[in-house]
Amino acid sequence: MASPAAAELYAAQGWDTVTLDLEHGSIGFDAAVEILRAIRGSGVVPLVRVPKGDPTWVATLLDAGAMGITAAMIDTREDAQRLVDACRYPPLGDRGLSRQTRAAMLHGLDYTETANTRISVFAMVETVEGMRNLSSIASVLGLDGIYFGGVDFEMSLRRAARGDPAGAGDTAAATASARKAVVEACRANSILAGMNAANPAAALALFESGFRFITLSSDAVAMTSQARAWVTDARNLVTAKV
């Protein structure tokens, strides 16, 4: 949600990291900076998800204090290399240098020397093309991990079969196979496999299958599901007394 206050409260609930979603969230840059401040003020690592690894977005958000980038729709090795180049200072990348950014001022004069080890970089693989190029993407030096977008991968399977409703086949089985492939590719390259879990039980299942960077639902889902449960319980309790 586009609210620094909500982000601050959410971040204070014991999370290791909180990700600000600029791919699907209706959040502008000014609001994003305030939300990053709120997350960091709660002692939590602030991460940002960006569309397609846009270099301008990436550089600006890192300068504003984001401690990690997860870039959507990374389909090729070239996409992954552009992402790393935007996130890493030389010699690992091409990130531009300024010692007067918020990030540099927060982390001290040695920020540019330490940022390459402090910043996390995840490439989202979530299409048929991305899975086809998984091995070459995962081998890009400077990536910390591959984040698998299971929902978009299923959509990609359906798009690939456009005009042939049966052509997508068993999308659930194909997605399960892709999840396994992501874990194997990450292990082969000594990087982390990541994915979102809808609930704690799903998070455990991902962990047991080899995922080590696991995000859990969202602030909007947490708020609405809890509110819905309270309303339902209250109505049921009152109805039982009538």
Per-segment meaning from a language model:
Residues M1-V242:
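Expand to "…catalyze enediolate/carbanion chemistry for C-C bond making/breaking, isomerization
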